[in-house]
Every structure is written in C-alpha cells, then in structure tokens.
Amino acid sequence: MNSVKKLVFFCLLTLGFASFVIAQSADTVWLSSLDVTKARQGWGDPHADKSVDGNPIKIAGTTYAKGFGTHAGSVLYINLRGTALSFESQVGLDDEINGAAGSVRFKIYCDKKESWKSEVLKAGEKTKVKLDLNGVKEMILLVETTEDGPNWDHADWAEAKFIVAGLHPETVDPPREKEEILTPKSSPEPRINGAKIYGVRPGSPFLFRIPATGKRPLKYAAKGLPQGLTINASTGIISGSTSDIGKHKVMLTVTNSLGKAERQFTIVVGNKIALTPPMGWNSWNCFAEAVDDQKIRSAADALISSGLADHGWAYINIDDCWAIKPGSDDTMVSGNARDKNGMINSNKKFPDMKALSDYVHSKGLKIGIYSSPGPLTCADYTASYHHEADDAKQFANWGMDYLKYDWCSYGNIAKDKNLIELQKPYLTMNDALNKQKRDIVYSLCQYGMGNVWTWGSAVGGNCWRTTGDITDTWESMSGIGFGQAGKEKFAGPGHWNDPDMLVVGMVGWGNLHPSRLSPNEQYTHISLWSLLASPLLIGCDMTQMDDFTFNLLSNDEVIEINQDALGIQAKQVLSEDDKEVWAKPLEDGSLAVGLFNKGMFADYVSVSLERLNIKGSPAVRDVWRQRNLGFANVSLTYKIPAHGVKLIKLTPVEKKK
C-alpha cells in the first residue's frame, strides 16, 4: 500500500513539475506581432494595434492597446506549427463607425474544421473567444459580412494573443490553386458571337462591329438592314443613321475558306438603347490617374488584336483624370478648365478628344467618358456642376458613346440624402443628354444610395452601380456579387444593375499586379456577373493579358448568358450556409444555373429540379467547358472547390410522340 502511495505521489509530482516547466517555457504571442498584412479583406488595409481606419482599437467603449484591425469579409491564415496551447480575443465592430449600421460574424477554423463562431455583432456589441489549440497546426481567422452587406464592417480582434510552447506562429498567404483553362479554343470555322439585339434612337449615329471568330480573312454580309445603314464586307462594321422606326430582323452572314455562319440580328429603332448589358473596358482599375491618350488608343488596339472584340467586347471607356485639375502645378493637367463659351477642356494628356474618338470608332468600337454632377470629380478634376448642358454637348461633339456620372463632390452640394436630392443631379444630366443627336449610354455611379435600383431608370439611367467600389479580393467580389439578391426585378433591357467592373488580369489602380482573386474565384466572378446580366467592363491592362485571363473573357457560351435578349437578371433560388444557387431564364427556353460554394473547403452543392421549376429530364451542358453532360433527373449535385462554381445550362427535351 505504501508503495502504491509513493507511486501516485511520484506521478503527481512529475506531472506538476512538467506543468511548471511548460508554464515557465510558454510564451505570450500577440496576434499583432505577426505579419497581419497577409490578411485578405473586403476594404482598406489590415492594421496591427490599430483599427482599419488607423485609429486606436476601441470596442463598445473600451480601448485596447493590442489587436488586429480589419474589415469584413476578412481572412487570415496562421501556421501554428503545432506548438500553440491557446488563443483568446475580444471581438466586435470598432467604435469608429460611430453607431453606423454595420454587422459581422467572427469565425475560427482549426485544421479545416469550424471551431468557434460568434453571434451576429452590431455596433456597440462585443464577445470573447478562448480556444484550446493543443495539437492544432493551422488556424484561420474569419470575419464575415451579414445580410446588410459590407458597409461599415470595421472589425477588430482586440487583445488577441496566443499562449505558445515552442516555435511562434506565423501568418501565411491563403492557398491558391493552379490556373486551369476551361474555355475550348475557338473553331477555325466562322461563328457569330455577342448580342442578338441592338437598340438605336431614330437619327442617331449607328455603329456596330459584327463579333465573329474563325480563320481570317472573314467576309461579312447583312440582309435586311434598315434604310440608311450599310455594312463593310471586309471589316463587318455596320454604320450610318436610320429613322426607320421599328424592329428589323437582319440576317448576318460570315464566311471564310472553311464555311459559313448565319445568325438573326434584331435592330430596334426606337427610344431605348442598351438592350443588352454594355461590354467593354474601363481605364480606372489599371491606370487610375496615369491614364492618357496613348493608353486609350493602346486599349482599343488590344481589344482588336487580342480577339476580344470578336467575342462582343465593344466599349473603350475613359474614367477620371482626363479634364483640367484646378490648382495643380502639374503642367500636364493644369490650365483653363473651360473655354470662353463654357465648354469643358481636356488636359494635355488628351490633346484631341475628337481625334481619339475617331480612332476608336474607326475600329468599329465605341468610346466612353467620365464626369461628376459636383464641381470636381473624385480625383479633383473639373466636373459638370452648373455646366451639364455644356458638357453633354461637348461629349456629343467629341463623339462619346457612354457617360459614367460619378457622385463624388456632389455630396458637398446636396442638402441631404433624401430621394429628391439623390435624383436631382442625375435628372439634370439626363435632360441634357436627351437633347443631343447621339446615343450616349448613361451610367449612374453613386454606390447604391437611396436604393438606386428602384429609381435609376426613372432618371434616365441605363445602368447604375449598386454598391461601393470593388477590389480584387474574394471578400469584396463575393460580397458585392451575392449581395445582388432581390434586385433582379429592377433590371431589364435598357436598365441594368451594375455590381462594378471586373477585377481579373493585371489590375492595381496605377500599381499593377495580377488579380488577387484565385483562379476558382475568378471563374465565380465571371459566372456570377454573367448570370446577373451585369454590365461587363474589363478593368485590367489588356496589353499585358495572359492566356488564362483571355480565356476567362472569351467564352462565348458564358457571354451569351449575359447578353441574352430576354434581359432577365438571375434570381437566387437557394442560399444555405456557404452554398448558393442562382438561375436565369434564357430566350431559347433554357435555364442558366450557377451552383456556388462560398465555403473555405470543397463541398457538394445540390438543388432539385423542382426548386428550379423544371419538369422532366432536361439536357445538361457544362457552359465553361462547352460540353454536354447528359440529362438531369430529380436534382443536380456537384462537388465544387472552395470559392468555386459549376455553371450549367438546362434545356428542356421534347418528348417524342
């Protein structure tokens, strides 16, 4: 008995000594001492010991000296090296949002399993997390947006620390899968691509380049053109002017040495333009203030030489920074903002806007420009306040086909943000545009204020931004894209919801880098924007386009979903945890369906045919791979990678009699 007591005593002594040794050797490692810049987040930059806005971290009235300030959606990967014993933190929205309507949910994954999640936290609320990490090798800190979207989601991991016995943790870059090109190469035989319908106002200049692929040279023809329009058989450019009101069924034909392609193309001469979402390129996401005449010409050249124009991409849009910048000492952008007649001047980077416009038009492409209803643009260049009529006339004189009208400094003019004040500047410019003998697509950019999707068309908008600016992160792109649910009833031919430009390829707002979206995320991006019937505006430097990016942007079956003549925006038909299914009816009676996995890891996504309102066993086609997959029965189920998509087309099959 005494020997047993001695053994127990010895074991307890050994255990206590071991615990003492571990306690003595354990370190406290603050999360903020690690490289938190490896975090990926939806807005702003991550900060150590500061909020996302760079202020001292403060949650629910308590200020914290240590912590990690970020913005939902946010993800930070941490290699624990198997030596971490525990983690704890206070979490919540930073008080710097001053009671604004943000809300977030915090989550922690340990070795690919969800280990903890908070309730939805709003301004003034906080909670504490404490986790045992014994044996855990990898940890992921997540902050998710909730149903109210990403605005004001300034999230803090306050006093976040690890207890570690051994090597210290280190943050790591998020995993990134290899690029896989899914789009098949275009056939050498001729194929006509892009939109099947086009709207023009009576008497307005008409310009349309038939998008077609196939071995060059191609020969183009168009039978049934309305009076006043002609086609160049060598370039496929249809031009002229017509007042022949009505719908004109035109048969387009493209031939080469290998065959012939035909397609019906409807020209609608009436009071509505932008019958399909505009497709093209915008300068801001790659060049920002560095934009100039030569870069615009190079973009037009690249749209042709790359072959993207053969898939329907048509607009070359100049964003901010083309006008005079008041008070600047840079001679390239300083000078007289307007001439003696009040007409706006371009700066020296754009020496001849009419010549630039003519150059773009000579290729069968269209050109766009940018302004603001306030005195200054967002980058402090001259804008249209009190000169709306002058500027609309100047834009038409220059030959512009598209106007992005950005709220910017008008926030200092508006008395408040009631509906009348929000609509007023856009009505004013719309009236001015309507007096021009030129069709100018009118793009409202005011970040969704006042639920612009409910009234954008009433003030003359052809499209309207529904959110703030997009960035090339999963958190930004997915938050904006999936946040379009419920807005579908406000979109249609001539008036489109706009979730912002595409962030694939070389982007960077002046400092170019490859998109931070993973390959799977980029497929999700293009698939979702196509289902949403969104304007598609490329934001990358097209002179540096790689094969992966080109193939993302040149899949004709994906583009046809976006450009479908019905103009129906996809509807969210399923949203469960991190799985979503969206469906878009198409003109030919088929249904485009996107099955999305928003989760951190590969998972199965299923949807029943009943939920899709489909009877029978429809034919299934993989749209990206352009491959038939047989027939569906009862439901669709696919294993989809993290942040990935399966984009399919379901076509009813007629029963044989």
Predicted regions and their residues:
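A short beta-strand micro-motif common to beta-rich folds, especially ectodomain repeats
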Residues: I210, G246-L258
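Strand-loop-strand motifs at the edges of beta-sheets in extracellular beta-sandwich domains
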Residues: G228-D244
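Glycan-recognition surfaces
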Residues: D390, R438-D541, N562
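Carbohydrate-binding surface patches
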Residues: Y523, W529-L532, L537-G539, S575-I614, ...
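C-terminal beta-strand-rich structural cap/linker in extracellular carbohydrate-active enzymes
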Residues: F631-K657
